[in-house]
Amino acid sequence: MADSGDKSQGMRPPPFDSRGHPLPRRASPDKSITLENHRLARDTSSRVTSSSALGVTESQPQLKSSPTRRNSSGESEPTNWFNQSNRNPAAAFHDESHIMEVDPPFYQKETDSSNEESRYPPGRNPVHPPGGVQLPGFRPVAAHSSAADDYRSVIDDLTVENKRLKEELKRYKQFGSDVMRKEKLFEIKVHGLPRRKKRELEATLRDFAASLGDSSESTSQRRKTGRHGTAVHSSGVSLSKHDSSSSSRSRPVDSAYNSMSTGRSSHAPHSSGPSLGRPSLTRAKSVGTQKVENYLRDTPDGLLPHHIVMTDKEKKKLVVRRLEQLFTGKISGRNMQRNQSMPSMDAPLAPEGTNMAPPRPPPEGLREACIQLQDGDNPRKNRSSKDNGSASNSGGDQTELGGTGTGSGDGSGSGGRTGNNTSPPGAIAPDQRPTRPRDLDPDRVQIPSENMDYIRHLGLVSPEFLQGSRTSYQDVAPDAEGWVYLNLLCNLAQLHMVNVTPSFIRQAVSEKSTKFQLSADGRKIRWRGGTDGTKFSSDSSEDKSQQSPMTEDTEDGSDKNGRRKKRKTQQASSEIGRFGPSRSPSDTFHYKPMFVHRNSSSIETSLEESMSQGSEDAVDESNMGNSKWDFSGSGTTQQRRKRRYDGAIVYYTGAPFCTDLSGDPGDMSPTAQMTAGREVEGSGSGDEVEHVLQRTLSGSSLPIRPLSDDRARVAEVLDFDPGNPPELVADDGSSPNDEDFVFPWCEDPAKVRIQPIAKEVMEPSGLGGVLPDDHFVMLVTTRRVVRPILQRQLSRSTTSEDTAEFIAERLAAIRTSSPLPPRSHRLTVAPLQVEYVSGQFRRLNPAPLPPPAIFYPPFSTDSSWDDGDDLASDDEEVEEVEEDSYSEGQISRRANPHFSDNNTYMRKDDLAFDTETDVRMDSDDNRLSDSGHNMRAMMPRAEAVDGDDSPLAAVTGKEVDMLHTGSSVATAGGAESGYSSSMEDVSSS
């Protein structure tokens, strides 16, 4: 009991219930842990404030072995904490007592009793020591102060500033293509420069950057020529975009497959001996120093992935082009020359004015492996070009002995030339050469005869059985039938990359091409189109007359070989004069936009257009003037909204283009080509300011509003004379005259004379409720007064005043909470007012009834129906009989609806007409039914008119358009005409 008494000392005994048990309740406020922490914080804060004011520093107990998180001096105010940390920042780290005092005072420590007790051993809690002893030197962790709120605004400002700095850093880190980063030469930023001057500066710097690449490349070319003057490289007489570099670094022309292979290198000097199959030391060293990403420069664009969304119509055209390429060797379309891979050339051309021919390349093996020799005596006989137009020898050296033969193509298959064999008989080419990526390019120029040999080799007909029947390699269908399995063509690379099915190919061929023939079962296809492919409407006219180099070389004879080489050499020299001795390798990685927003009215897009463009065309289109994507003259993206900041303009070494990260504003549409050394093409004088087309919010480009602006301003802008308006011209070219108008103009209304009305006979109609007496004419005289322009302007101003007055009255009614007084609305008078002067009503004579209809019943005893002589005597009587006898009952019912159907229709069994009469009845019935659709409603009865001068009569006064039905039909009415029933005719007869 003593222990219990000690524990309950200082506490109020809990109340007990009726059974003597203590009631469960919370502890007293004096023993609350949360309130105790608040008291400690308040007391400590007050002590620190008083001691700091008196300059007295409170002694701090050194508890080095205490495991507390914070062992501070007791300052809980954020101001004191910041001051102490800023004045002596190293003390908190060197002093062992301040080793954990690095957190700001905003750290809120949990004050839960369970968490406090779990962090410290029993009896070791420094905040709540055992026995209620309080250590005076410890700062409470849950300090609340108003000074903490002062720094929250500072933190918010720092957060905003940090965000702004991140955006600025991201803006300064903007680069162009990652691949072009190594070729970057310099970048500039333009601030406040006019657009025209900015474009001039861009053109000047662009030419300067391109000239740097040309000079470095020409230096490297001269060094290569002097060092390897007798070395032999891959052949070709036309330029290639791969034979250039933006710096003095050199790289192989071929791909990684050819460069890293252990076979004989085509770039090593020709030699014989044990080192025939090894690359040279210089070649191996250059390969080892290069990076793998450089090999991608030689990858053709046709092998690169192109994720392009095409419609079915565009895909069908692409399939037809690919199929025709197999049989013609050419790609039809606007970009025929652009997409076809050109041969690679690594050796420099001979200087102008010299007669030195380009060096002859060494003999090179075939791309495919030779499995079995067919002729043991001459192993080189069967090694002629069979590599599907992809060998590297374009000089025609691999020909049969003692004659001429077809040489293989170059790296892109554009060879196929013929020439005499001048190589020594003992020189034997190696067995096989490595496959290059350009050999697999689907866009390369192909040889149709070799394509057919390849297809026959897959299982159709062996080529050796057709050697006797084949006389020329130009025959695109050498076999007798010419049928090729369609499933076989689908597996070729040209169509396999498009990802189409045989059924889709059949549909495309049947719809888009007339030069193929499908078999009856649809499994085979053959070519019937000659040597040219299908020309689509989307193809430009300039490409229709172009031919590929392979076709031109194949069709020419061997006697034209010299002229052909000379012509191509001159063409290559002219290109060197324009773009320097070589093109930069960055042309391969020319900037292509990721998102191109084209107009719906633009011409159709094909897959070849969306692929990588040729170096020359791509640079010209996207860097100078308007391109087909509507880009600006500095390689920028499409017209867009004006940015909040200006980006940098990046220039690259040897590249004739730049990357403008700022772009031009949306209203900028340059239409001129800008260069540094020439004047601005397509523009007038230099002082002219470029006209920017302004549009209204509704999208109109007119500088005026014809319906709301003043007539004088409209006439001035549109160059229109209000006093002398132009004549209205009809569609047939005739202009209307004043005589064609119905209402003549009259200055004096008192002298108006009513013209006499022509007596027109009212034709009878079959409308119900119309009597013969309904025959009248309304004569109305009108007068139109044109108000002057001044009065019209006054009425417009009064309208605005009325609006202001109405708004003022409405506001006054709202303030006084009184009902709105009734306001008299003024009627706006139209500029042209119509006044009715007089109106007359004249009743005409009743319309006469039509003559009686003639009808012969089928049971009549009269024999005149079958008498041919009587019918042929009078043609008019025959026509009348046929018109009136085809359906008398139907006419009677339409003209006289008051009669019963029993009196108007005859029985079907009683009608016995011949075949000729039935046919004529049908034709007449169709004619009358068509006329019934064109009937118009006539004027109401005369009794509906109130009087001659009534406004209703004046308004409804119009001339009645009579309907000419062309048939004799009685006018419906109340009086019987005596001819409404056919039974009366029977009884009277």
Swiss-Prot record:
Compartments (UniProt record): Nucleus
Inducing stimuli: By light; perhaps through white collar-1 (wc-1) and white collar-2 (wc-2). Also activated directly by wc-1 and wc-2.
Acidic residues compositional bias, start-end: 865-886
GO cellular component, one term: cytoplasm
GO biological process: circadian rhythm; regulation of DNA-templated transcription
Span of the annotated motif Nuclear localization signal: 564-568
Record PTM: Progressive phosphorylation during the late circadian day and early night. Phosphorylation is also involved in regulating frq degradation. Phosphorylation by CKII may have at least three functions; it decreases the stability of frq, reduces the protein complex formation between frq and the white collar proteins, and is important for the closing of the Neurospora circadian negative feedback loop.
Biased composition (Basic and acidic residues): 36-45, 109-119, 377-386, 433-444
Residues with PTM Phosphoserine: S513, S519
Origin superkingdom: Eukaryota
Function summary: Circadian clock component involved in the generation of biological rhythms, in particular in rhythm stability, period length, and temperature compensation. Oscillates in abundance with a daily peak early in the morning. Behaves as a negative element in circadian transcriptional loop. May bind to wc-2 protein. The complex frq-wc-2 may turn off the expression of frq.
Designated name of the protein: Frequency clock protein
Natural source organism: Neurospora crassa (strain ATCC 24698 / 74-OR23-1A / CBS 708.71 / DSM 1257 / FGSC 987)
